[in-house]
């Protein structure tokens, strides 16, 4: 769903690239996080309750990404085992011992876009 262009104040639509990452406290994850949330947050929160309720460290804590889940056995074995391919299935096993985690050349266009 495309974000609604902020109508009244003439603000630019808040997009980060092609996808919009928005949180309830008005902070956006990514490169454009420092910009002010001019139009859209005023419409979503017309009384300005969010700025009075959230202090600055609260909204920075809400904007921080959650820590990755700890899996101690898998982290122990990950130095010895082949990293599981995330549904891609194109990682060569021998490239682990060769030059790091490089997918094979045929799959390189399918791994996270173009790498």
Curated annotation (Swiss-Prot):
Protein name as catalogued: Uncharacterized protein UL101
Region (Disordered): 1-86
């Amino acid at each position: 769903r495309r974000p609604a262009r902020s109508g009244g104040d003439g603000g630019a639509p808040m997009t980060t690239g092609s996808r919009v990452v928005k949180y309830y406290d008005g902070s956006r994850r990514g490169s454009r996080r420092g910009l002010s949330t001019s139009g859209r947050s005023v419409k979503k929160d017309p009384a300005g309750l969010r700025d009075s309720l959230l202090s600055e460290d609260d909204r920075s804590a809400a904007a921080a990404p959650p820590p990755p889940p700890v899996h101690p056995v898998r982290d122990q074995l990950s130095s010895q085992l082949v990293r599981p391919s995330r549904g891609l299935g194109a990682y060569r096993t021998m490239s682990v011992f060769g030059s790091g985690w490089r997918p094979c050349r045929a799959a390189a266009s399918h791994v996270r876009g173009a790498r």
